[in-house]
């Protein structure tokens, strides 16, 4: 159907977000996704919106559904909608951008992006001896599958179980400390103070899974309730993904919104939707403490908006670990002393696997509706500070279509890389510690995992099970130390 001029004199093809919904019931993930979508449709209002949905996209989760978008579409009364399954490793901003582009081009009228997790539901059933059986979809395949292009880490990292995000982000945060010239004690206090401020925000979030205010000193101190995971991180520095949480957004054009009678006070406009599909592992990054790809996105967004991102009034930065927030603050030119969250972040609001961006967007949209003169920033982190994304939203249009782009080429042009040694045993010789973390045996430091710059100009992963060295690396700066590397292990030179 062709729509006439849009309300407010806008091009009728202008995309707009009209509904957000969340769910946190004790139910399997597909039920949460259906509930969140139904809530988003009800939030939008209007006539016949559910039946007009022609596109449903879901980011892959930890569940086993082959086509969850089809389950959602059928349940809301949109059996003809095209189902999209988007693999882990593609920024969640990309799902939103794709839907916006389809609406702008006329390929879609009403799109839903929805995702969710129910790890707590499964855990509680297993603990009580009940089965956690998911809805089966025998013989069902999605209409469209978006597959990631390449993994975010090197084979040598996978082979030696260095895929654990807490270890990789801990190494990034330690690199930030060295780049900033902080002491180990100053650094731990700084990142714990940031997380304490996030926790204070979570108290005001009725949907926070672990909403409570905690002190920075408690966060910084390992204890049985806050056990050490990977130096400098303890449990409550980490995202908490054992939650039951789902979120959905409904997008359409202003022409469709007007035709269906969706009240304009529900409308929130995308100003910017940017991502980079470039993938470079932590091991191969010349500058581990920075994120040039996100810098490119931030500069591009600021130029389009005509104002620096530090002036955007509402922000929710992806917050799986303190390093993610700290590096993004620097990359986007935000106040390093700020508290860029309205939810309380992934440690306290909850971090449903591969879906926090949709939870963030729902929360930011609610703030923007209440404060229509403000702009809202939502960022995406895919992988290990691998593929960035960001969206800027406003309850007021600016008369232009949103800026939508994948800036992979631009990101690659400013990202310096280093060749990685292919195997743990693939280098013998001298080197310098570029970054590191320490893993634990219970409460005791047990192993140092180091990324080293080799004397022949490459990068390698090397390990030490010297417990005295591990303990020392938790109290003294270890980055910059000269080491002798051989057979996959190292010792101070």
Across the structure, where does each feature detected by a protein language model lie?
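Active-site capping/gating regions of soluble enzymes
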Residues: 376-378
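Internal, well-ordered alpha-helical segments in soluble enzyme and binding-protein domains
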Residues: 95, 168-172, 357-360
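Oxidoreductase and adenylate-handling cofactor-binding alpha/beta cores
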Residues: 363-370
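A conserved active-site cap/scaffold subdomain adjacent to cofactor or substrate pockets
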Residues: 349-357, 373
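Conserved phosphate-binding catalytic cores of ATP/NTP-utilizing and phosphoryl-transfer enzymes
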Residues: 93-101
């Amino acid at each position: 159907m062709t729509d006439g001029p849009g309300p407010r004199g806008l091009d009728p093809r202008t995309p707009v977000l009209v509904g957000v919904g969340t769910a946190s019931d004790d139910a399997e993930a597909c039920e949460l996704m259906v509930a969140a979508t139904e809530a988003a449709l009800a939030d939008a209002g209007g006539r016949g919106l559910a039946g007009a949905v022609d596109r449903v996209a879901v980011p892959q989760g930890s569940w086993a559904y082959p086509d969850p978008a089809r389950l959602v579409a059928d349940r809301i009364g949109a059996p003809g909608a095209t189902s999209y399954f988007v693999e882990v490793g593609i920024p969640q901003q990309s799902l939103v951008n794709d839907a916006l582009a389809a609406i702008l081009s006329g390929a879609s009228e009403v799109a839903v992006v929805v995702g969710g997790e129910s790890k707590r539901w499964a855990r509680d059933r297993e603990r009580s001896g009940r089965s956690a059986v998911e809805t089966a979809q025998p013989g069902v395949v999605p209409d469209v599958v978006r597959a990631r292009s390449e993994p975010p880490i090197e084979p040598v990292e996978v082979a030696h179980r260095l895929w654990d995000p807490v270890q990789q982000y801990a190494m990034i945060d330690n690199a930030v400390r060295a780049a900033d010239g902080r002491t180990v004690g100053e650094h731990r206090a700084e990142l714990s103070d940031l997380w304490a401020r996030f926790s204070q925000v979570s108290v005001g979030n009725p949907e926070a899974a672990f909403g409570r205010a905690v002190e920075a000193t408690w966060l910084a101190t390992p204890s049985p309730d806050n056990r050490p995971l990977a130096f400098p991180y303890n449990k409550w520095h980490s995202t908490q993904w054992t939650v039951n949480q789902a979120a959905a957004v409904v997008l359409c054009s202003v022409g469709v919104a007007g035709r269906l009678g969706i009240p304009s006070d529900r409308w929130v406009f995308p100003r910017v939707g940017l991502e980079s599909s470039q993938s470079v592992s932590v091991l191969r990054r010349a500058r581990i403490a920075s994120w040039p790809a996100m810098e490119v996105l931030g500069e591009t967004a600021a130029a389009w908006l005509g104002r620096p991102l530090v002036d955007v009034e509402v922000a929710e930065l992806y917050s799986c670990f303190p390093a993610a927030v700290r590096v993004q603050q620097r990359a986007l030119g935000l106040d390093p002393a700020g508290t860029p969250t309205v939810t309380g972040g992934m440690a306290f609001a909850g971090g449903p696997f591969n879906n926090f961006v949709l939870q963030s967007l729902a929360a930011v949209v609610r703030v923007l509706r209440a404060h229509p003169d403000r702009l809202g920033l939502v960022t995406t982190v895919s992988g290990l500070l691998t593929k960035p994304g960001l969206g800027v939203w406003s309850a007021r249009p600016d008369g232009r279509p949103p800026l939508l782009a994948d800036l992979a080429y631009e990101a690659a042009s400013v990202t310096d890389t280093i060749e990685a040694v292919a195997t743990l045993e693939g280098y013998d010789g001298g080197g310098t510690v570029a970054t590191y973390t320490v893993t634990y045996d219970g409460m005791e430091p047990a192993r140092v995992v180091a990324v080293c710059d080799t004397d022949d100009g490459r990068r390698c992963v090397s390990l030490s099970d010297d417990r005295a060295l591990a303990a020392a690396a938790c109290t003294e700066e270890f980055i910059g130390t000269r080491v002798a590397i051989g057979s996959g292990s190292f010792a101070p030179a």
